[in-house]
Each structure stands twice: as C-alpha cells, then as structure tokens.
C-alpha cells in the first residue's frame, strides 16, 4: 500500500491534512495522485489484458522469455499498438512468468590424437551471406531416467541458424554424424561448396567422416582442441534445446519420450520459434523472406 492510498483509505474518518502530515506527503501531491486514479485504472486494465496475452504465448512451451514474447506480441501489430519490451518484462515479473535458464552440460567431445586434424576456416565467425554456405555441428547427450543417454548430432546453417540436418541414436559413433550431414544434404538438395565446422571430437576427425564430406563436396573446418567458444553456435543450440525440453528436469522418463520431445522441439525451432539472430523470426521464415527479397531485387 502506498502512502497516498493510506490517506485515501482513511480520509472519511480523519482530516486529509492531518493524514498527510502523519505519512509525510504534501496535500497537493495527494490530490494530484487522486486525480490520476482513472488513468491508473485504465493502465491497470490494459496491463491485465496484456498479462493474459503474455501468459497465453508463454504457455505454448513455457520457455519463451521477454525478447521472443515481445516479438510475438508485436508481430503484425499496428505501429500504435506495439508493446515495449520493458513493459513486457515488468508484467512478467509481476505475474511471475519467466523463461528457462541454461544448465551445465556433460562433455561429449573426446579428441583422438591419432586421427586427422583440419584448420579452423571460420575463426568464430559463424555468419554467412546466403543459406547453404557455412554449417556448424556438434554431438550432445540426451539423458534418460534409467541412467542411459541418447545422442543428438546437429548440422546448423550459419545464415539463418536453421537446423538443416540432425540424427539421434543410442550411440555417438561416426555413423551418427554421417547421418546428420546426410539429412542436411537431403534438406538442401546439395551441400557442394559448403563449409562444415565442428570440434575435434573423434567422430569428426575420423577418416570415414572426412570421406563422406569429400563425397558431398563439403570442406571441413575445426576449432581449437578444448575451446568451446570455437564452436559456440552449436554449443548454444544444444543448451537451448535441453533447457526448453527438459524444463528444469534432469532426464527424460524414457527413450520414446525423449525422441518425441526432441522431434517436436526441432520442428518448432525451424518453423515457429522466434530467433533473435533472425530478427525474431523463425529460421525458415527468415530464409523465405531473404529469398523473396532477392527475387524482388532481381
């Protein structure tokens, strides 16, 4: 309760002047506050309506934070009806609505000093001017309640952050990353001329994977040994996936649930989930609008 509200609540029983002296506020300030009451009521009603919209968006996956919820609210809105991110943040705090936060990850990169190494062609610059030019990939573990793990291999396009290819299995042998890169080839039609960047895990330095890359026309690139920042884009994707699917839990109840939830999430990631890199657009939408812009310019 504010001091002004205290005065308002007791002014029928006591003199306003005396109440203002007790709570140490000026009478003019109290009357100004009182005159603004209708405007405050209008703002409170608008905030309540906005809170309902925010909760409806958040409840779709219980993972979205202020930036993506703000983008969702403003998507297609009239310029005069756009919502400021600070207002969204304030209402989310008041309503105790929050996105999910990162958790620590288990190390899955095990370098094999006996295998080949290749240079770092990206130098931590994961951007690309067009789709299908630069890809990054990694393997991450997916914990299951019985103590086992599934493993997910990813191929992410640096232009749009689209997950172009992925594979999931009970092992992290070289076949897993070969399947993921093949899935990306199927998505794009061809990977000829593209760069694929990874860490120095034994799977990525294997002869079998090198031969598969050559067969697809892909040039390999690798970051420094033991430096996660050299593959930060893939690491960030893995952390986001587990944060938004496990939602604070430690493991999936079984393999079937794990596979189903990961499939649902990666589908939503590409088609519906707003990405800050893409100007708060989903990756596929970002690519489509880029292609449309090029056609108009031609």
Segments (PLM) and residue ranges:
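Charged DNA-binding/catalytic regions of mobile-element recombinases
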Residues: 1-298
């Amino acid at each position: 309760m504010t001091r002004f509200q205290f005065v308002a609540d007791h002014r029928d029983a006591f003199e306003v002047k005396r109440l203002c002296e007790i709570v140490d506020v000026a009478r003019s300030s109290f009357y100004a506050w009182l005159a603004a009451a209708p405007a405050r009521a209008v703002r409170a009603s608008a905030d309540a309506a906005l809170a309902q919209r925010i909760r409806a968006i958040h409840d779709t996956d219980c993972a979205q934070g202020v930036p993506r919820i703000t983008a969702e609210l403003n998507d297609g809105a009239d310029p005069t009806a756009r919502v400021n991110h600070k207002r969204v943040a304030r209402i989310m705090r008041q309503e105790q609505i929050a996105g999910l936060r990162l958790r620590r990850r288990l190390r899955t990169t095990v370098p094999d000093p006996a295998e080949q190494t290749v240079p770092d062609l990206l130098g931590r610059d994961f951007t690309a001017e067009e789709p299908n030019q630069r890809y990054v990939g990694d393997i991450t573990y997916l914990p299951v309640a019985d103590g086992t793990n599934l493993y997910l291999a990813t191929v992410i396009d640096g232009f749009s952050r689209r997950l172009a290819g992925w594979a999931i299995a009970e092992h992290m042998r070289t076949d897993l990353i070969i399947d993921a890169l093949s899935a990306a080839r199927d998505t794009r039609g061809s990977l000829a001329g593209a760069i694929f960047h990874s860490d120095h895990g034994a799977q990525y330095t294997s002869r079998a994977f090198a031969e598969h890359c050559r067969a697809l026309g892909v040039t390999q690139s690798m970051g420094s040994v033991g430096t996660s920042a050299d593959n930060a884009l893939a690491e960030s994707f893995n952390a986001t996936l587990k944060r938004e699917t496990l939602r604070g839990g430690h493991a999936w109840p079984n393999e079937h649930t794990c596979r189903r939830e990961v499939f649902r999430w990666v589908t939503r990631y590409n088609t519906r989930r707003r990405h800050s890199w893409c100007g708060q657009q989903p990756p596929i939408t970002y690519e489509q609008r880029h292609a449309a812009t090029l056609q108009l310019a031609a």
